C-alpha cells in the first residue's frame, strides 16, 4: 500500500477505534500478529489487545478524543503527532475518578502490512497527565528551597566540629 493509503488507515483507526469506541472494526484494521510495543507484555498482541486498550482508556475517559495534528509516512510506517483530551470519569490504574479534564500530546508510530496495523509504538506524557488529574504533585520553588535548606543543615550536622 502507498504511504497515503497507510495514513488514511492510521486516521481511520484513531477515529473509529479511539474516538468512537467502535471495537468491531479492530479485526478489520489490526493484523492477527499485531504487536503493541506500548502495552504491557502479555496483553499486547492481536486485535484483542487493541480492543482491551481502547476499552480501558475509554472507561477512564468516556469522552476520549485524539486530534491528529500531523502525519508523516514513509514506506509502511506512519508517524503521528496527536493531541489527546478527555475527562477522567472512570477508574485509572486503580485511581478513582477525579472529574478533571486532561490535554496531552502523544506521538504514535504504526507499521502497516496489507492494509492492517502490524506494530505500534507510542510516546505519551503520562506524568503531565497525572499532574493535570491532581494525582501527582511536583514540588514548586518554595518547597524545593525548603528541602534544600533542610538537606544542607543535615549535611552540616555531620561535619566535624570547627568546620
Residue ranges and their predicted role:
Residues 1-163:
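C-terminal and inter-domain tail/linker signature
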Amino acid at each position: 500500500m502507498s504511504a497515503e493509503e497507510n495514513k488514511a488507515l492510521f486516521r481511520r483507526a484513531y477515529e473509529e477505534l479511539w474516538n468512537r469506541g467502535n471495537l468491531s472494526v479492530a479485526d478489520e484494521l489490526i493484523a492477527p500478529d499485531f504487536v503493541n510495543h506500548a502495552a504491557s507484555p502479555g496483553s499486547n498482541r492481536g486485535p484483542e489487545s487493541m480492543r482491551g486498550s481502547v476499552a480501558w482508556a475509554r472507561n477512564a475517559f468516556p469522552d476520549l478524543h485524539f486530534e491528529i495534528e500531523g502525519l508523516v509516512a514513509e514506506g509502511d510506517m506512519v508517524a503521528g503527532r496527536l493531541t489527546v483530551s478527555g475527562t477522567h470519569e472512570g477508574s485509572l490504574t486503580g485511581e478513582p475518578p477525579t472529574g478533571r479534564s486532561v490535554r496531552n500530546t502523544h506521538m504514535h508510530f504504526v507499521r502497516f502490512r496489507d492494509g492492517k496495523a502490524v506494530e505500534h509504538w507510542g510516546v505519551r506524557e503520562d506524568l503531565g497527565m497525572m499532574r493535570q488529574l491532581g494525582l501527582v504533585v511536583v514540588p514548586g520553588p518554595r518547597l524545593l528551597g525548603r528541602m534544600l535548606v533542610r538537606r544542607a543543615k543535615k549535611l552540616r550536622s555531620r561535619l566535624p566540629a570547627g568546620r
